[in-house]
Design a protein with these regions (language model features):
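Walker A/P-loop phosphate-binding motif and the immediately C-terminal alpha-helix
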Residues: 51-88, 201, 205
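Extreme N-terminal, non-catalytic leader segments
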Residues: 1-58
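Residue-level signature of catalytic and energy-coupling elements of molecular machines
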Residues: 48, 59, 85, 93, ...
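Short glycine/serine/threonine-rich phosphate/pyrophosphate-binding segments
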Residues: 61-69, 90-94, 169-174, 196-200
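Phosphate-binding loop that captures ATP/GTP phosphates
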Residues: 80-82, 86-133, 137, 144, ...
C-alpha cells in the first residue's frame, strides 16, 4: 500500500512548494529595498565628514537663509559642501542658491545633486516639481520615504560638510534623519526675538537633547527689527 504524500502548509494557509504569494513577494521586495537603502545611507554617512542639522521651532525665522549662508561660508573656506533640503512641502533652498528651474540627473539608479555657487551640491524637492506653485500634498509615510531616498539614493560623493535644512517644528523629519545618518555633529537652532519664537526654540533644544545631538549654537535672526 502506497504511503500518502505529506503536505505541509505555510503560515498564510498555502501549501509549501507553491512559492510566495504576490503579497509576500511585494513584502520581500520592499524589505530588501529598505535593507539596501539603509546600508546605502550608512555608507554615505561615512563619506560625509560633518553633518549639521539646521532647525527652527517656528516658521518664517530665516532658517533656510541661515542654512544657505552657512553652506556658502564653509564652501568659501575651501570645503566640499552639500545642502540637503528636507522641507518637502516648502522647499526654498534652490531659489536662494540660484538654481530655479534645474532638474536632477539620474544615472544608473543614483541621483546626482544640482551644483550651485562655489560648487555647493543641492538636493531638494523643488527640483522635482513642475513649477514653484505646485503644492506637495503627501502624508507622513510618503514624506519620510522621500527623505530616506534623498539620503540613500543620492550620489553625494566625498563631502566635508552636509548642511541639512528642515521644515519648522520638531516632527518626524529630523527624527528620521538622525536615525538614518550616523554621527550627526550637531544642530543649529534659528529663532527671532519674539516671545513665541523663543518659546519654540526652547522646544527645539529639548528635542535635540532627546536625540542626543549637541546644540552647536542658537542664531537670533532679525534682531535689529525689535
Amino acid at each position: 500500500m502506497a504511503e500518502s504524500p505529506i503536505t505541509t502548509f505555510t503560515p498564510n494557509g498555502g501549501q509549501s512548494g507553491e512559492g510566495p504569494t504576490v503579497q509576500q513577494q511585494k513584502q520581500m521586495e520592499s524589505a530588501y529595498a529598505n535593507m539596501r537603502r539603509k546600508m546605502a545611507m550608512q555608507e554615505i554617512g561615512r563619506k560625509i565628514k560633518h553633518k549639521i542639522m539646521v532647525l527652527s521651532g517656528k516658521g518664517g525665522v530665516g532658517k533656510s537663509t541661515v542654512s544657505t549662508g552657512l553652506a556658502l561660508s564653509l564652501a568659501q573656506q575651501g570645503h566640499a559642501v552639500g545642502i540637503l533640503d528636507i522641507d518637502i512641502t516648502g522647499p526654498n533652498v534652490p531659489k536662494m542658491m540660484g538654481l530655479e528651474g534645474k532638474r536632477l540627473h539620474v544615472e544608473q539608479g543614483r541621483i546626482h545633486p544640482a551644483q550651485g555657487h562655489l560648487g555647493v551640491k543641492v538636493i531638494s524637492m523643488a527640483f522635482l516639481l513642475e513649477d514653484e506653485d505646485t503644492p506637495v500634498v503627501w502624508r507622513g509615510p510618503i514624506k519620510l520615504g522621500a527623505i530616506q531616498q534623498f539620503i540613500g539614493d543620492v550620489e553625494w560623493g566625498e563631502l566635508d560638510y552636509l548642511v541639512i535644512d528642515f521644515p519648522p517644528g520638531t516632527s518626524d523629519e529630523p527624527l528620521t534623519v538622525a536615525q538614518s545618518l550616523p554621527d550627526i555633529d550637531g544642530m543649529v537652532i534659528v529663532t527671532t526675538p519674539q516671545d513665541v519664537a523663543l518659546l519654540d526654540s526652547r522646544k527645539s533644544i529639548t528635542f535635540s537633547e532627546s536625540l542626543k545631538v549637541p546644540v552647536l549654537g542658537v542664531v537670533e535672526n532679525m534682531s535689529g527689527y525689535t
